[in-house]
């Protein structure tokens, strides 16, 4: 593709003479030059103004010249020379990746004009003029404008590279293309863009900026000229078959149009599809009634821009000519006014819906100047009178199609618990956020580790109260294991260490479903109490020595492995040798003890070392503390093993009860094989330090350090990881479906305010935790019900996947509305479902879709981004239902009568060619 450069900003400015002698005599003195240029640089940025780039080297030389104060100095800079900023002196393209302050300085137009008039511009260089543009939240000089490749539909091989500002309108691109390609004034033209995927998008709105149109440097823009016979030559364009949603021959049902996912924007698509299928709101935009009510001066609004963007979207989706559309213009408009929706992160469809309804209301508010309105005082007055006054006050400041369609009225009653003072207010609402009845129980999956080493750990599923404590978990597990709750310690194990050791009073809400929870059978306490005779429970880690990568260094690293242990040790018999023996006993299921043959084989050739050990009895106690314990001779060990094994449930090794093991003479004449050494460590399993047994009682974490060869020969990793499943593992907590009316009843029940949100009682003159009750007083034409599926607490976040059963027709609110009933108009309280926003997945990720009933056909459809398919009514109810849209029956009946009396014009019956469709056939 041939590219022809054309930079409309590159017109040369008449320059003064290049040398100092030809400078005009009107050049001011140096101080005045410095003041004029320096003051100009401090000028604030204003959108649309021109600034100019000056090469940093020339500017610094000029700066030194004027600061020197000598007008005849040799530092005279000469003509402005920006050659270092250009790639070459033919195309005059700006070099890439120039940095302000390092490569150039920016000057506003007045300062630039001064310098040019004083010093001139070298070699007929074009001035580097750039515009100030306004981006969301910031103004900046657009040093690198957008470069677009303009082509004609009749010649896709020859492209013109044209620079534009991101703040320029699409219409400027169109007019530039018409000028460059010599299009006659009477000829019709339109633009298309080719995106990175190769498909083409129609640039329908020519009044928006290139930034809002999401155009990028290097993007291909195609100008299409209408044929003389009135048709468009779109079919001849390269790549048209990549646009299945832009088919001029496609004539479908209005409203059955998908929305392309721009990247995690399914939440937006779902909210838009629901709102688009609210009949009275869509008719309001399709019939252009919104044009008469746009409020451009509302300081709380978006200058009408959000309403206009939504109107364009509705008109496209209800034109009947699109299978799907790309809502990038609307997305950019939302991000422009609500920074939380900038980018392409996942958000909540209900949050976007709330912003959209509020934004549309303010953009379409019929009240141009809001007056101050005092709050109603309902003390001692009839509810009917107070409610009517509250609604009238609301309408005096808020009057729009959104209020007409979606706003209702609450009655809020607060009662002081001390003096009984009652406060009644009536407040408007736009939607109901109703809680789901939460199950008071939860199922926890835990591993029970018995003291008997012959038994493998057991996997259990226990039912516990959601708001219970760790003690409730121990009681529930006790029914499965027959172990007393006070003989259990609950731990969160993560990465081979104890992440947390729980106290009995700790809340269960601190345990997440993904946590690995181990419950250990013990006979004592972890934190010793002075004077207590209880056993000490010692946390024990397993570590393997690994050679350092520096082979000239004798240092060995240590890596945790396996599951940590909690070992009960008698307080008055705590010793290294006793701890070693009890650990050997606890590990006996998956650790093989060395035999006499192993000892003999390993000690051959080392007799001299054994003799040294035997003779050095005077220093044996010191060695014991430094290197950890060794084993007893074969006879004594065997007796202790048998006693330990026969101790049964206590799991307590009798060797700890033998006073002789606490003396310094316990090592035998001949040392036996030592499988591991013991070290005191911190809770992370690090920070080794030599510690006496007495000190170990105050720093109870112990590590068993294994040599790699010892671990390989004697430690059975497969057996160590083994466990059995208890019969309760298959238990699943049954979740019964919930009726929508149960949620509404829960919404209207009395609740006590939380400590973080007290109420100020005008009678007590204090903040009180009052009781609060909400009642429905007046319902809107379209009632939006938000099911609060997402639960947040201090320790956890979860999504409730409870099935909420809701009626498609005849949802009767008469039992919830406390306003005196109009018996002659029962339809005022009955509603029919028209749309559902669904959420699939969990808290961190998920996907939004929509069920919606077409206002013209009455057929339900499933909208999944750009995919749309018809569905039966029995498919609508699911656990994914998140936001429900109900329409009052009297409104629906009135709309049906209006529609039947009118003759709709369908796309199929229209003979006028659609100017927004590109033929792909």
Curated annotation (Swiss-Prot):
Localisation: Nucleus; Cytoplasm; Chromosome
Biased composition, class Low complexity, residue ranges: 1-16, 895-915
Protease in keyword set: yes
Keyword Cytoplasm: yes
SMART domains to which the protein is assigned, alphabetical: DUSP (SM00695)
UniProt superkingdom: Eukaryota
Classification via Pfam families: DUSP (PF06337), Ubiquitin_3 (PF14836), UCH (PF00443)
Keywords assigned: Acetylation, Chromosome, Cytoplasm, Hydrolase, Nucleus, Phosphoprotein, Protease, Thiol protease, Ubl conjugation pathway
GO MF, any single term: transcription corepressor binding
Phosphoserine modification, residue list: 596, 692, 906
DUSP domain mapped to chain residues: 28-133
Primary localization class, coarse: nucleus
Modified-residue entries (N6-acetyllysine), positions: 194
Family of the protein in this entry: Belongs to the peptidase C19 family.
Function description: Protease that can remove conjugated ubiquitin from target proteins and polyubiquitin chains. Inhibits the degradation of target proteins by the proteasome. Cleaves preferentially 'Lys-6' and 'Lys-63'-linked ubiquitin chains. Has lower activity with 'Lys-11' and 'Lys-33'-linked ubiquitin chains, and extremely low activity with 'Lys-27', 'Lys-29' and 'Lys-48'-linked ubiquitin chains (in vitro). Plays a role in the regulation of pathways leading to NF-kappa-B activation. Plays a role in the regulation of DNA repair after double-stranded DNA breaks.
Official protein name in the record: Ubiquitin carboxyl-terminal hydrolase 11
Native source species: Rattus norvegicus
Gene symbol of the encoding locus: Usp11
